[in-house]
Design a protein with these regions (language model features):
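Short, charged, amphipathic alpha-helices and their helix-cap/turn boundaries
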Residues: 1-2
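Domain-terminus/edge residues, biased toward the C-terminal soluble/receptor-binding domains
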Residues: 13-205
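Short, conserved loop-to-beta-strand elements that form functional interface hotspots
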Residues: 9
Length: 205
């Protein structure tokens, strides 16, 4: 986080207490990895006992329990920030973190959140790039592997493999999926001996 600074634990307005919508989304995504946090922000109602009396606690997130896939996270309000809402939604194999800041009313806060979530659901799709990359790599091997010369080595005894993607599944705009292109850049000459895991090229998407 580079544009976030916390001065107090309560979050009331202060010149030195600030963040951005993007970094609030990053922080929320990290916080959801904590099972206790995830359980609390995903709970619609809870009853506690105070001095022998029952006290009902109601989550102020209007979307929780009223929109498919919503599982958190937090409403907020100060005079400086106005109405805020960070929402977590899981649908269509996507985990969406939506941040709305500075809304004039609760209604606008909720409606803007719904619009943003629906925009993502209608325009993006999770694509497994690893499968596409593997297919492209196999095609490249069949066409070009034998053109790579390793001087002083046994001809055609070169074995190559593809490093797995760290994040193989990513959201991509639906109208861009069919236009994805791949380009393989590689060296075609080496001197033996070659170390295991020598990089001979790269595949760009």
């Amino acid at each position: 986080l580079v544009n976030t600074h916390f001065e107090t634990p309560h979050g009331l307005d202060s010149d030195e207490h600030y963040t951005t919508a993007y970094e609030l989304a990053l922080l929320s995504n990290y916080a959801l990895k904590n099972p206790t946090f995830a359980k609390i922000v995903g709970t619609k109602n809870y009853t506690i006992t105070i001095n022998g009396y029952l006290k009902a606690l109601n989550n102020t997130n209007e979307l929780l329990g009223n929109m498919d896939g919503i599982y958190g996270i937090k409403t907020g309000f100060t005079n400086g920030a106005n109405r805020c809402l960070v929402t977590a939604c899981k649908r269509n194999n996507m985990d969406i973190i939506c941040v709305v800041l500075g809304a004039d009313t609760k209604k606008f806060r909720t409606l803007d959140s719904i619009k943003l979530i629906n925009y993502v659901l209608n325009n993006f799709e999770i694509v497994n790039l690893q499968n596409l990359v593997n297919n492209e790599f196999d095609t490249w091997k069949n066409k070009h592997l034998k053109s790579i010369l390793v001087n002083k080595a046994i001809p055609y005894n070169l074995e190559v493999s593809l490093e797995s993607l760290k994040n193989p599944e990513i959201p991509i705009r639906k109208n861009l999926i069919t236009s994805l292109s791949f380009n393989v850049n590689y060296k075609n000459y080496f001197e033996a001996p070659l170390d295991i895991n020598t990089t001979i090229g790269s595949l760009e998407i």
